[in-house]
């Protein structure tokens, strides 16, 4: 989760005093990197995935499942057995926000050959097996986007009570600080977001109105005035960073061959973010209730929203410099490539001094405004040992701001003095239950980048329409019910990367004729006379590539999953979870997920993930049986 400096974290007041210093030197660090590597070309295609995991403990006797707060110990063991013993170990493990979470990546990035697609799932299996092997009896490693009873009494093991007093990090009514990773970054981030905002974060998620759900659904918090004011009728109220950052996701990072290719990919993939988010929907439950949304994006956005009342436009600007329209965790606000310029129709708040400085240093308008927009934010954490740095050889101040702008896409300059190239990170996906599904989504996105670059595809539409798509993508059953703005003719491009922009795009104004509302089925699978479909385009690309039979078979299986999720033939994880709850004998059609229901659901998820049972409505009936079977949590053990 971004920069993980070690050391002594400063208080919020001290961090604030150094904010201008961090921004000033962050920009100098960016300029050093930019001037050193702006002309670097021919970096090879490399890419890698990041999977976030939750650790759970099953109490089979009492039919209860809890989040296991020993991520630190598990991580230490995995790193000791892995990368510290063998630098070429096939897996890497990193901390995540929750003390019940860990993050796993391949040990080395994947390369540009087609056969690499056949190794993704094997590596994910290795990770699952490796982490499972260090767990105790009745414990399991799960890839679940949101734990349904996160924030309910007794949801952690060991159990801890929330402490809503001022001294803590969250001050939450529901989420104990013990559930936050012990690394100083995470608790400090939590505390400083709250201090900067001037109040606790506010998350209100619409409740799903079932037959017996109270109407209006109202929760009362007589002991907490802040919560009483912030909670809304017919909504599930949450009050801590952990409700967002304590969820799991799936991300992919690509290295481009040059800065211009990275900027082109950043823009093109930004339009795909809402589509893939809806396709990967996997988080319908919050704080023990069934919600009316399927994705975590809005929850996580609100959970780290550090904007003050002035910045949110609720009071006139007096102590702050800017009115800011979005949380620092949200969709991108500007395209970076020349082709995207005319589609930049969102008002962009920038630090004009930084913008002018960047222009004077030879940075073009589009990149300068992107960086000047990121730098309207304050640093949220600062370590005493990291205040005075060598700007020519270090980038911690730049990364401090960059890594706490959590957007759908991230444009990543190389670290100083490294052979790493310009990268882009694709960030909107929800994590899936199985390694097969997670591999399918990763391979789909990576293949799409190959096709975008090979065929010079153009998905650009006005950025305001992408934002509208992001809102639709989070709605319940968006994959089947939602309509999304999408470009009609995606094949007009000339040599988009080399020329910076295709001939077809030289007109200064975008035309409403260029895009229309489409279903995800149309976007993914195509519709005659309307749109060719992304999967038919990927298939045509594959037909022209040298691919061995085994790899081709794997890729086709992955694409079949995406195709069938888009058409509705297979369910999203969110829809499958809703059906599971609705059909549970203990469910009272009141939108409440009890310990018993939660236990049954997570147990089933774990069995599916470890291939101890089939789930044709989620994976398809022909889902191939694999040799690996892990997990130590089945009650039949």
Curated annotation (Swiss-Prot):
Pathway: Sulfur metabolism; glutathione biosynthesis; glutathione from L-cysteine and L-glutamate: step 1/2. Feedback inhibition by glutathione. Its EC number is 6.3.2.2. The modification N-acetylmethionine is found at residue 1. InterPro entries: GCS, Gln_synth/guanido_kin_cat_dom. One of its GO terms (molecular function) is glutamate-cysteine ligase activity. The keyword Cell inner membrane does not apply. One of its GO terms (biological process) is response to cadmium ion. Keywords: Acetylation, ATP-binding, Glutathione biosynthesis, Ligase, Nucleotide-binding, Phosphoprotein. GO terms for cellular component: cytosol; glutamate-cysteine ligase complex; mitochondrion. It catalyses: L-cysteine + L-glutamate + ATP = gamma-L-glutamyl-L-cysteine + ADP + phosphate + H(+); (2S)-2-aminobutanoate + L-glutamate + ATP = gamma-L-glutamyl-(2S)-2-aminobutanoate + ADP + phosphate + H(+). Most abundant in kidney. Also found in liver and testis. The modification Phosphoserine is found at residues 5, 8. It is an enzyme of class 6 (ligase). The keyword Ligase applies. Belongs to the glutamate--cysteine ligase type 3 family. Heterodimer of a catalytic heavy chain and a regulatory light chain. Catalyzes the ATP-dependent ligation of L-glutamate and L-cysteine and participates in the first and rate-limiting step in glutathione biosynthesis. This is Glutamate--cysteine ligase catalytic subunit. It comes from Rattus norvegicus.
């Amino acid at each position: 989760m971004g920069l993980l400096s070690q050391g002594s974290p400063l208080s919020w007041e001290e961090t604030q005093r150094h904010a201008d210093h961090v921004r000033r030197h962050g920009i100098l660090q960016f300029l050093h990197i930019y001037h050193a590597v702006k002309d670097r070309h021919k970096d090879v295609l490399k890419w890698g995935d990041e999977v976030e995991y939750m650790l759970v403990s099953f109490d089979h006797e009492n039919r209860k499942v809890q989040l296991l707060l020993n991520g630190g110990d598990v991580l230490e063991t995995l790193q000791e057995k892995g990368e510290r013993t063998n630098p070429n170990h096939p897996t890497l493990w990193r901390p995540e926000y929750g003390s019940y979470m860990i993050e796993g990546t391949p040990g080395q990035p994947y390369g540009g050959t087609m056969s690499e697609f056949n190794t993704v799932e094997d590596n994910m299996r290795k990770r699952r097996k490796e982490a499972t092997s260090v767990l105790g009896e009745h414990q399991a490693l799960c890839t679940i986007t949101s734990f349904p009873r996160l924030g309910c009494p007794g949801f952690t093991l060991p159990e801890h009570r929330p402490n809503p007093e001022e001294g803590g990090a969250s001050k939450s009514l529901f989420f104990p600080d013990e559930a936050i990773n012990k690394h100083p970054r995470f608790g400090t981030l939590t505390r400083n977001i709250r201090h900067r905002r001037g109040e606790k974060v506010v998350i209100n998620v619409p409740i799903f109105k079932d037959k017996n759900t109270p109407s209006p659904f109202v929760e009362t918090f007589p002991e907490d005035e802040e919560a009483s004011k912030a909670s809304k009728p017919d909504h599930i109220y949450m009050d801590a960073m952990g409700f967002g950052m304590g969820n799991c996701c799936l991300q992919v990072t690509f290295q481009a061959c040059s800065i211009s290719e990275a900027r082109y990919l950043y823009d093109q993939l930004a339009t795909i973010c809402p589509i893939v988010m809806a396709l990967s929907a996997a988080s319908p439950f919050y704080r023990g209730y069934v919600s009316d949304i399927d994705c975590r994006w809005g929850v996580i956005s609100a959970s780290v929203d550090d904007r003050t009342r002035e910045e949110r436009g609720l009071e006139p600007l007096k102590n702050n410099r800017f009115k800011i329209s979005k949380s620092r965790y949200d969709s991108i606000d500007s395209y970076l490539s020349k082709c995207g310029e005319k589609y930049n129709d969102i008002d962009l708040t920038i630090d004009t001094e930084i913008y002018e400085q960047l222009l004077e240093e030879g940075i073009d308008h589009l990149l300068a405004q992107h960086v000047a927009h990121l730098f309207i934010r304050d640093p949220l954490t600062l370590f005493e040992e990291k205040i005075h740095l060598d700007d020519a050889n270090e980038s911690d101040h730049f990364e401090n701001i960059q890594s706490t702008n959590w957007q759908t896409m991230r444009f990543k300059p190389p670290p100083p003095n490294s052979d790493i190239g310009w990268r882009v990170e694709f960030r909107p996906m929800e994590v899936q239950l199985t390694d097969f599904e997670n591999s399918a989504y990763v391979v789909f996105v990576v293949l799409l980048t190959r096709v975008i670059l090979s065929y010079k595809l153009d998905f650009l539409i006005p950025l305001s329409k992408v934002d509208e798509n992001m809102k639709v993508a989070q709605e319940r059953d968006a994959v089947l019910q939602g309509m999304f703005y999408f470009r009609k003719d995606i094949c007009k491009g000339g040599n988009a990367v080399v020329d910076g922009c295709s001939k077809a795009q030289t007109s200064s104004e975008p035309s409403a004729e260029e895009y229309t509302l489409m279903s995800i089925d149309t976007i993914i699978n195509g519709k005659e006379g309307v749109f060719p479909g992304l999967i038919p385009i990927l298939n045509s690309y594959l037909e022209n590539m040298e691919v061995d039979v085994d790899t081709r078979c794997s890729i086709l299986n992955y694409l079949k999953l995406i195709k069938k999720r888009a058409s509705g033939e297979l369910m999203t994880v969110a829809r499958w979870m809703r059906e599971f709850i609705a059909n549970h004998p203990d469910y009272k059609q009141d939108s409440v997920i009890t310990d018993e229901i939660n236990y049954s659901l997570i147990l089933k998820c774990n069995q599916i993930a470890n291939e101890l049972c089939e789930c044709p409505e989620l994976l398809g009936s022909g889902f191939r049986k694999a040799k690996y079977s892990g997990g130590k949590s089945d009650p039949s053990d």
